[in-house]
Amino acid sequence: MTDTADAVVVGGGAMGASIAYHLAAAGAGRVVLLEREAALGTGSTGRCAGGFRIQFSSEINVRLSLASVALIRGFEAEHGLPLDLDVDGYLFLVRDDASWPGYRAAAATQRSLGARVEELDAAAAEALIPGLNVDGVVGATFGPDDGIADPSGLTNGYATLARRAGAQIRLGTAATRIWTSPDGGRVTGVSTPDGDIDAPVVVNAAGVWATALAATCGVELPIHPEPRHVVTTSGFPGRPERRTLVIDTATMFYFHREGAGVLMGMPRLADAVATFETVVDDRWVAEELLPQAVRVLPAIEDAGLARSWVGLYEMTPDRHAILGPVDGLAGLYLANGFSGHGFQHAPIVGKITAELVTGAPPTVDVSSLRLERFARGELIGESHVV
């Protein structure tokens, strides 16, 4: 059986749901969103920490964040749908004299583009988060407009809006192939287990599975999965009252208040090897993550572990997303490789993707993020990957 659509979006995380909504709302015709699992947001979206921030080191990420954070913070007022969020900021702690100038330069870039970012000394950082170990801290940056939002709420909110705008969402339906014209110059649709869908526009928002899908139409994406552990604790005396997300830049250990306890995580050296494995390494949690947690917030020593899980980042060589059309393959649009910040950029990327598809001027110029930058050697670089 062959179906038809004007645009097919592959991937039902926050990114795909946002793209589907914005396409439908922009009048892109019949929009179909395909999600391989039985529910939306069960991949990287459902396993992320939910943070959103303006504090990045590259100008393009700051511009995207400024626009996306505004959409997140205004979501409930604009759409009339509930979204649980806390705007208590992000705090980056720097304990290395050699690294501090780079963080100050990043803060200057952020402020030059309109962000509110403060530079704090150790005492001010401890005053913000009482109980924080600031021994050796040479400086900190604090973004008061950064915060934490509910990933499920945002994803399902955009899905609700997409349906209201006329989009169709098909759960339990994987896109197994992207088809192209005989001359290979444009996409013509996708295959699913239920049959083909003919469509002149296909948006690949398949997260860590995007590389395999793109390969079916001859497009090579330089993306690999990188597992990240997340752990939550029970309540404990001295738990911070603010829901500020605190990052110790020496190891990129982070935590924020979550319920009665905290949610925390940290990159693991072994995870630099590309793998789709999502099994929790309990020994690493006990021997590496927890000692680091106690070093940063000593009161955590009295907490018990509640839950732990592993999610996957979709990493690119320059730790920036791959966005936009593909040279030589009309109708294919990419929204991939967000390197850990896909959830927070989903609102604005959905809007920009719809603008690119419909020919409207993009809210943010993302031409520097096109796939072709890798072949040209025009990598960007981002130091603030948590």
Which role does the model predict for each range below?
Residues 41, 195-242:
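Central helical "cap/lid" subdomain
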Residues 141-200:
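Helical element adjacent to the flavin cofactor pocket in flavoenzyme catalytic cores
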Residues 24-45:
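Glycine-rich FAD pyrophosphate-binding loop
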